[in-house]
From Swiss-Prot:
This protein's name: Outer membrane protein assembly factor BamC
Domain of life: Bacteria
Domain comment quoted from the record: Contains two well-defined domains connected by a flexible linker. The C-terminal domain may serve as an important protein-binding surface for interaction with other Bam components or substrates. In addition, contains a long unstructured N-terminal region, which is required to stabilize the BamCD complex. Only the N-terminus of this protein is observed in the Bam complex in X-ray or EM structures, most of the protein must be highly mobile.
Protein family membership: Belongs to the BamC family.
Residue positions bearing lipid (S-diacylglycerol cysteine): 25
Species of the source: Escherichia coli (strain K12)
Amino acid sequence: MAYSVQKSRLAKVAGVSLVLLLAACSSDSRYKRQVSGDEAYLEAAPLAELHAPAGMILPVTSGDYAIPVTNGSGAVGKALDIRPPAQPLALVSGARTQFTGDTASLLVENGRGNTLWPQVVSVLQAKNYTITQRDDAGQTLTTDWVQWNRLDEDEQYRGRYQISVKPQGYQQAVTVKLLNLEQAGKPVADAASMQRYSTEMMNVISAGLDKSATDAANAAQNRASTTMDVQSAADDTGLPMLVVRGPFNVVWQRLPAALEKVGMKVTDSTRSQGNMAVTYKPLSDSDWQELGASDPGLASGDYKLQVGDLDNRSSLQFIDPKGHTLTQSQNDALVAVFQAAFSK
């Protein structure tokens, strides 16, 4: 018992220590670029010749274990930057990236046509980057100074860029060339910084293009799901049903609201089985007129609805209060009713 209590206390102490450690590490991300530990190694005494006491015979020396003397000229201590080289990200579907010198490139498929250049310009304008020169015919522009703000820098950088879109074989190349780079007002030209801040701008553009593509896809899906076509059909046994042009997930999500519009209230549902129980109360003549459909002539009562998954379509089959499927004429009458309900 004592062992268990002691073990529990140790676990709690270890957990608290871990939380404090993570909090300390995340409080200032500048330390991600520095070697862990203190800088006592900078004060270490240099290597010295070994002097043996009088009368002691030392083994024969061997050059195999000699430590060479070096005169390092690189950065040490907090001046040492251990961050890996920055890499441009191919966030756009089907794209790839490359980096050469001071230029980062994003190669995308030609399918975007003439929309790529306006999208690149829109990304920069959305970020409020000032454009000093712009040639839409040549699809090239030059920015004013872009101020960067990174937590892993002691002094912030700013850069001027030339950005262009050019055909390259069967692809289009979005190119970012770093024209000037400064840190705290002083010019910077080291390879690591040039790569990091060329890549910084490229990744901003890449993320913006990816967001545009995602927004366009979502808008297209919303348009498709807003106007879902409804048709009369029959199942494998010849019983009437409705077929909605829309995937099961979309139809299932929109069904309760659509049913409510036609006078059917959902009282129970099981998504995994595609079952719904609804109570039907016919609408008034004015409500049918407002919906834009005619009264299908169904009797009041409790109905069961079976929703089927037909890949990019869904089936709706109603069972009346007496346990029978709807007649063909009743099913056909519901086509216009649900077409109107899904469209509103």
